[in-house]
Structures are given as structure tokens and as C-alpha cells.
Amino acid sequence: MSMIVIDGSYGEGGGQILRTSVALSVITGKPVRIYNIRANRPNPGLRPQHMHGILALKELSGAKVKGAQVGSTVLEFYPGRARPRHIRVPIKTAGSVTLVLQALLPAMAFIGGSFEITGGTDVPWSPPVDYLRHVTLFALEKMGLRAEIEIKRRGHYPKGGGLVVGRVEPWEERKPLVALEWRHIELFGGISHATNLPEHVASRQAKAARERLSEFYDVPINIYEEVSRSLGPGSGIVVWAETDVLRLGGDALGKRGKPAEAVGREAADELLEQLTSRAAVDRFLGDQLVPFLAFAGGEIKVAEITNHLVTNVWVVEQFLGKIFEVEGEVGEPGRVRVVG
């Protein structure tokens, strides 16, 4: 089978190209060569956090891999015979659990299996695990995919130590997703957590988010407050709007010197901003859905076309040909439809 060749510096030019490329290699059985990996970044090449996703997909598919070392700017991935497995990913730092799952979920959807990942559950520059559980999986369930994620322990920067387990059922009935504009909001949900911190931190984050959301919408607000223990302190909040179509989300992380009230308001404001265009899909979910839309079909309207989304469309089309139509400019609301 001929090898797919991907320029890793294209578009957003980050780790997402790697995650999507290797996941699609597993799904399609096509080997892939990725060059110029993170070429435009201050520290080019593979970083430790990228290795975890690649090695998890290697294990899932029995692949042969060349160039899988930190600093490498070229990776070759030759998928083997994929079968359902229990995948363990021990990230010894606060490396993102959810970025590993962004690589693992699309591939596992076609195979089934279970996973156990340690690392950072709520860390900068990646979706919080509660967003993945309550927003991403909610959308994937509408597409016929059944998956579960359970948080056993939180992990924050810099110590990590979080533990997430879950399973994915083989995706047998693929349902096209048509998610254009929402008409009404049924409720706001959320989870405010504080780890190795006083209980009032979670309460104050939740209270500030409730107050902010209620200024704009008169609907029920259910934000759960969670207090837990782990290797190090940290806090955060994820809020979502459950609409008549999908859920849209917003989130924020606490940090030393940042008042809990500011954290709660930040998450609420991010969600409120996503709601202004009435698009059914928020800007974070849009790019996550692209690999699944490729196989299920459908059309979505996103609150914002992002570089991540455009890049993910490009990567998918290197494997499957021209199947997407993207309408709208980066930074603006827009539509993504499957035409192939």
C-alpha cells in the first residue's frame, strides 16, 4: 500500500497533525510519513507529550515505527493488524491525558478497547477532561459512538498524577451529524473542582460562573462542586450549555494568585462568547469532530473556524481525498460539510 506523506509544518503545524495522521493511519491501514514535524516551533521535532499518543496507537495497531524519539522531525508509522486491546499510557509528568485521547479515540472507535492513562487531566493548552466527557462524548454519542471516560484522580501542572480510565465500543452504526444552529438552551451544566485546596475554592468558582450565566439566560444552572486529593494542588471549572442540538462549552484553570471568582467568570464568559453566533458547535469541538465526520457524514456550523479545524480537514483529506467543504474565514463563524 502506498505511503501517505504529510508536511508537519502545514497550517497550525503542531502536535495535532501528528495525532490525526497516526490515528488515520491506524483506521485506513495506510502507512504514513510525517516530515517537518513542528518545524516552525522554538523547539522543533517530537516532544515527550507527542510520544505518548504515538506509542499508544503503535500498541493498539501492532505498528512498526521509525523516528519515534524526542527531537525527531521525521516519523514513519506502519500500522499492523489492529485489534481491541487494553492500552496503558503512563505519562510521568503533567502531560495532557486529553491530547492522548484525541489520538486514541478516533482509532479506537473502529476497533474497540479500553484505556488507562496517567498524567495531567486539567492542564494548560489542552481540553480539560471534563470537557471531553461532557461535551465531546455527548456529540459523538449523537453520531452513534459509545465511549466512557471516568476520572479516578485529577492531575495538574507540574506534578500530574491524574488517572483516567475508559472504554470505547466498536462504532457499528455511524449516524451523520447535522448540527447547525441551536434554538433554545435547556440548561447550563458544569463541574467546578478543587484538588488539595480548600472546599471554598470550588464553591466560589461555581458561584461566580452561576452569577455570570444568569445575567444573560434564565434557565436552570447545575454546577457540581468537587473536592479531591492528588499529587499537587490545582483547580478549574468546565461549564456547558445543553441546547436542543448539542452542548457548547467553556472552561478555565485556577492558578496561584488568581481569585476563584475570576476563574468562574472566565469560564462563563468563554461559554457566553461561543453562544453569540447561535452555532451549534463551539470552536473547541469543531476540530475534534472532523475525523469522525469524515466517516459518518453530516454538516456542522461552528462558532469559529480555527486554524486547528482547517489543518485537521487538510490532514484527513490527505488520506481520504477531497471530502470536506469549509465555508467561512478563520476567526469567524462558519460551516463544515462532508461532500465526498
From Swiss-Prot:
It catalyses: a 3'-end 3'-phospho-ribonucleotide-RNA + ATP = a 3'-end 2',3'-cyclophospho-ribonucleotide-RNA + AMP + diphosphate. The keyword DNA damage does not apply. Signal peptide: none annotated. Its main location: cytoplasm. GO terms for molecular function: ATP binding; RNA-3'-phosphate cyclase activity. GO terms for biological process: RNA processing. Pfam families: RTC (PF01137), RTC_insert (PF05189). ATP binds at Q102, F284, L285, G286, D287, Q288. SUPFAM superfamilies: EPT/RTPC-like, RNA 3'-terminal phosphate cyclase, RPTC, insert domain. Its EC number is 6.5.1.4. The active site is at H308. HAMAP family: RTC (MF_00200). NCBIfam families: RNA_3prim_cycl. Catalyzes the conversion of 3'-phosphate to a 2',3'-cyclic phosphodiester at the end of RNA. The mechanism of action of the enzyme occurs in 3 steps: (A) adenylation of the enzyme by ATP; (B) transfer of adenylate to an RNA-N3'P to produce RNA-N3'PP5'A; (C) and attack of the adjacent 2'-hydroxyl on the 3'-phosphorus in the diester linkage to produce the cyclic end product. The biological role of this enzyme is unknown but it is likely to function in some aspects of cellular RNA processing. This is RNA 3'-terminal phosphate cyclase. It comes from Thermococcus onnurineus (strain NA1).
